[in-house]
């Protein structure tokens, strides 16, 4: 059964990163795994400081990945920002029937878009924004409907 669990400063402890790291599978490339660990620890610290919320995606108790979200402003436009999107290495690029025949990463981005749309109805919000790690990911996000800000590496999804 698919489940999204929300973690914020109210329900997370200083050992939050230990739980997240024990629930996921990092890259088999040691340099990439080290980079992922650094990002995950940083995101977990942001959760404890109330600046980020993390949603883990689980299937039958197995963590498929997570998305970290925060509120920001890009070029003076209020935005929901994807701070980090992580997919456990064994699920990267894998289409899952349990996720309505989509990849974990796409499922999490679509979830973030829905949250942004819900927020837009309650407060002024214009975009969902993210900073892709590389050009390959830029194409993935363009296919979903994201566009690049002019003169910046950031991408946005207009709500």
Which sequence ranges carry the predicted segments?
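Non-catalytic substrate-recognition and accessory regions of acyl/acetyltransferase enzymes
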Residues: 1-102, 106-159
